[in-house]
Amino acid sequence: MIRVRGIHSTAIAGLLDEAGFRFADLSQELLARIPQLRVEERVLVTVKDTDDRSGVVVLGDRAVVEKVAYLLRAVIPGALVSYVGEGPYTTYAVRLLSRVEGDVYEAEYSPGKRTTVKLRRPHVEGEVIMAHVIRASPEAPLLKEGVAITGSLVRLVQFDRHSVSEHIRDENLRLQLLTLAMTSAPTGWGVHFRSASKRASIVDVMAEIKALSEKAEKILKEVAPKEPGVVVPGEAIAIVEIPADASIRMDALRSRYYPTLPLHHLLKRLGDDELSRAVDFSERLLAGCEKCLSSTGAIEVFLERLSSLKGRQVSVLHRKVAGAGHVWSAEVESVKRMTVVLKRVVSSPGLYDGFEGLKREPGDVIRSYTWLFGRAVVHFYTSARGELKGVYVNINAPVFFAGNANTLGYVDLGVDVTRAADEEPKVVDLAEFLDLVERGVLDKQLAGSYLEFAESVKHLLEKDIGEDLPARIMQAQKSIFSFETDKLLAV
């Protein structure tokens, strides 16, 4: 039923096994770690790492995805869950509004909601057509013209090419399946063979192609939507962000099923294959001696990696909960134990976010202070002459390495605290933060701690805003939050 992949697979498989779930397409390594896992043939849901290993993506059958995602949030305090029921390959009726560029149009996909859709044929503004989701989002999914129909073995996609799942690696079988698609697919439709096809008989695969083809023909003949909305359900998707504080809870969970080094998942996030193999080897030696090592060694690894960044350009991944966001680059000006100072020089004019009319001018310098496991990034905006223009404090889930040791990352929680040089401090963007709480993305108790933290930062900004401000904000974090990562700030 559930396929599990990635650095979180042992912890998640053990948890889901206790909850009564069954598994499919398991690796031999995972079965060796947890031999009691119950296995069946069909894959309904896949759980895999996000690109930077800071969480997991849960994708597949709607009912199962929802159960898995919210079980993870219930068991792992600090995890952030963004659930989209109408995920990949959901087919919508959309009303074309205006052309954006080339064959890309702005369209209404649900009453009052807009997104962009890529067309495959000429159409006119105001026309209602059918299109399917190719990139899910709770706000504005990216759509592509054509109907998509998903079965357990194959998927039919209008105007698409035939394809085979990357999990089917047998070249002879791939060729056999593609040949089958060319002889049995309806005209104008592409067949995608899902991973379950490799364990099914050709007769069963042919039968499902036929059944979906008949469904496709019926939809094209009988469905003539006049208004935007869902036409054919697709897969659901949940993005479960596991910030550094929640990652330590994952370590504790994993240790119930297999010997686990302290800070195991944070070490794995560094993307260092040699270090990853060393972690695996050490854990094999730890059987029967789970308390042999402390977290001190892992912390020293993190500090060593952070220190090595001094004087270099690094990327900072500013993520939103649903996976969107942006990347900014900066020079690492200094590193002192856990704290890092990042420097950028402004090259183009504009206005600073979070302020009313505060000008951003070429030559301005932005110094950003943060620290490993920091729940804030403190930005000082100064003119080319060194005059302070303002301070912007971004409140976020804990900062950590993102996918490799040259990239830092955090999840933006929406709420920020600002103070222009001659004004009083204020909390901004609170509506975005409260929306996360309302949607169930952020646990209410944890949300309360973040609001207290924001108010504490605001209070600190009412006082002197000198270079010791980041250190005082770090102390506020330690006094408000009680996760293991917050305790590590004393290291």
From Swiss-Prot:
For biological process, the GO terms are: rRNA processing
Stated name of the protein: Probable ribonuclease FAU-1
Q: What does this protein do?
A: Probable RNase involved in rRNA stability through maturation and/or degradation of precursor rRNAs. Binds to RNA in loop regions with AU-rich sequences.
Keyword tRNA processing part of the UniProt annotation:
no
Q: Which InterPro entries match?
A: DUF402, FomD-like_sf, Ntdp-like, RNA-bd_FAU-1
As one GO molecular function, the record gives: mRNA 3'-UTR AU-rich region binding
Gene3D superfamilies given for it?
FomD-like
Q: Which residues form a coiled coil?
A: none
Keyword line? Endonuclease, Hydrolase, Nuclease, RNA-binding, rRNA processing
State which Enzyme Commission number(s) the record gives: 3.1.26.-
Q: Which HAMAP family does the protein's record reference? A: RNA_binding_AU_1
- Family assignment? Belongs to the FAU-1 family.
Name its species: Thermofilum pendens (strain DSM 2475 / Hrk 5)
Q: Which Pfam family would be a valid example here?
A: DUF402
